[in-house]
Amino acid sequence: MPPNDRAEKQAAAQQAVNILHEISTILNCHLDRQTLSICISMIEKGINPEALANVVKELRKKGQENQLEAAAAAAASSSTTVPSRRR
């Protein structure tokens, strides 16, 4: 592939990612450019887009649950910690 064609393809791919990122931002999807690029690549390789969307939703849900559990554990541990006395 000639260098010029490759550069044009890269520019077109970057433009597509930028447009999809703008759409993602407008729709409050909270997907960064890297994540969008990965999703695009997976879809281009034949992954079902709807299934991929469901996986992303499930991962987000689990991530939020883990953050809540970690925050609760941190709060519980800080409330039960007795400050040490210095002599």
From Swiss-Prot:
Keyword Magnesium (UniProt): no
GO cellular component, as recorded: cytoplasm; gamma-tubulin ring complex; interphase microtubule organizing center; mitotic spindle pole body; spindle
Keyword Cytoplasm in annotation: yes
UniProt cross-references to Pfam families, sorted A to Z: MOZART1 (PF12554)
Primary location: cytoplasm
Top-level taxon in the UniProt lineage: Eukaryota
Residues spanning the signal sequence: none
UniProt entry keywords in alphabetical sequence: Cytoplasm, Cytoskeleton
Localization in the cell: Cytoplasm, Cytoskeleton, Microtubule organizing center, Spindle pole body
GO terms under biological process: gamma-tubulin complex localization; microtubule nucleation by interphase microtubule organizing center; mitotic spindle assembly
Subunit structure: Part of the gamma-tubulin complex.
Role: Required for gamma-tubulin complex recruitment to the microtubule organizing center (MTOC).
Similarity comment: family membership: Belongs to the MOZART1 family.
Cross-referenced PANTHER family: MITOTIC-SPINDLE ORGANIZING PROTEIN 1
Record-given protein name: Mitotic-spindle organizing protein 1
Native organism: Chaetomium globosum (strain ATCC 6205 / CBS 148.51 / DSM 1962 / NBRC 6347 / NRRL 1970)
The organism's taxonomic lineage, starting at the top: Eukaryota, Fungi, Dikarya, Ascomycota, Pezizomycotina
